Amino acid sequence: MARPWTFGIEEEYLLADTTSGQVLASPSPAVTRRCREMLGATFAEEMFLSQIEVVSPVFDSLHQARSFLGENRQRLGEALGDFGVGLYGAASHPCAQWLRQHPRGTAHFRQLFDDYRLVARRSLVNGLHVHVGVPAGTDRMQLINRVLYWLPLFLVLSTSSPLWGGQDTGYMSYRRVICGEWPHMGLPEPLADWHAYQRYRGLLQRTGALAEDGDFWWAIRPSRRFPTVELRICDGCPRLEDGLAIAGLYRHLVQHALARHDGMAVSREIRWITQENYWRAARYGRRGTFIGAVDQQPVSAEGWLAQLQSWLPADSAEAERSFMQARRILREGTSADRQREAYALARENGLAGREALRAVARQVMAEHFPGAGLPQGEIE
């Protein structure tokens, strides 16, 4: 990903039974083989046998991303359907038993589970990650500092983990609560520039706190493999269009933040505000009240998005479509909203608690296919 402003998307999925909605703790070798065959180089293993990751190629446009990811979703979904298996893309599963999941046995993941024990075992969650390429010579820590304040808004737009272990957690993104159990997985440390980042990394490596090839899992980070800044705060998005809107907004934000220096550089105050907004985003999602950076006044999620658009004018058709879809998400709801609504409806229709949770899981899997959630005239 060498060209600036190109981007890539990583999506994590759980493999689940399409009839029961239950996560498959030990998918058959044939299912795993089919995933590899269908995805090729875009297939990646994840922490659990029941989890996979789809790593996109490098894209130049949202149209290109929509075409590739949409076709991938359709083909893989249909192929796995032959086995009675579906792809569960929300950030948490409503009734999966994490203690029954089998960790993947490769050396990398064995080390991860050995180091982090129960924290790793509990992390049966899916995220959406977006890489954006930046020009050579860019100080990526300075760039991260300029976009830091807006990160919780991306979490608001993606929330999809309200249900966990058979319960309503009260959070819109319980995944971020689980992420908080890990070291180096919240907001990035207050590092002024790339030199400070290198000193911090070197300190942890010298003292044995970070392996030589170790990584930070911050909500946003400079990638070690690519010349990119990687957004990691987002919950997994079952609907393709929601993930594309987030990718489009993030790409637009990074591109414009690099060109301007007026007002969003990180101060202690901005970090305080961002940390508070981060918690509110996880707890309340789109119904939360947040703190504006400029006037430090309460602002709704819709008002917050409008502030982003005023700071970041939609100067392309792609940017305008991304803002339009983001407004639709805030108006109609995220996956977290739809899961709670589906659970309430299932209970009203007489399903017991466990069966109602499985109905939620089946609905999430149905949203995997392209076009879910779009008005008919907008399905490409």
Curated annotation (Swiss-Prot):
<keyword id="KW-0547">Nucleotide-binding</keyword>
<protein>
    <recommendedName>
        <fullName>Putative glutamate--cysteine ligase 2</fullName>
        <ecNumber>6.3.2.2</ecNumber>
    </recommendedName>
</protein>
<comment type="similarity">
    <text>Belongs to the glutamate--cysteine ligase type 2 family. YbdK subfamily.</text>
</comment>
<dbReference type="InterPro" id="IPR050141">
    <property type="entry name" value="GCL_type2/YbdK_subfam"/>
</dbReference>
<dbReference type="InterPro" id="IPR014746">
    <property type="entry name" value="Gln_synth/guanido_kin_cat_dom"/>
</dbReference>
<dbReference type="Pfam" id="PF04107">
    <property type="entry name" value="GCS2"/>
</dbReference>
<comment type="function">
    <text>ATP-dependent carboxylate-amine ligase which exhibits weak glutamate--cysteine ligase activity.</text>
</comment>
<dbReference type="GO" id="GO:0005524">
    <property type="term" value="F:ATP binding"/>
</dbReference>
<dbReference type="InterPro" id="IPR006336">
    <property type="entry name" value="GCS2"/>
</dbReference>
<keyword id="KW-0436">Ligase</keyword>
<dbReference type="InterPro" id="IPR011793">
    <property type="entry name" value="YbdK"/>
</dbReference>
<dbReference type="GO" id="GO:0004357">
    <property type="term" value="F:glutamate-cysteine ligase activity"/>
</dbReference>
<dbReference type="GO" id="GO:0042398">
    <property type="term" value="P:modified amino acid biosynthetic process"/>
</dbReference>
<keyword id="KW-0067">ATP-binding</keyword>
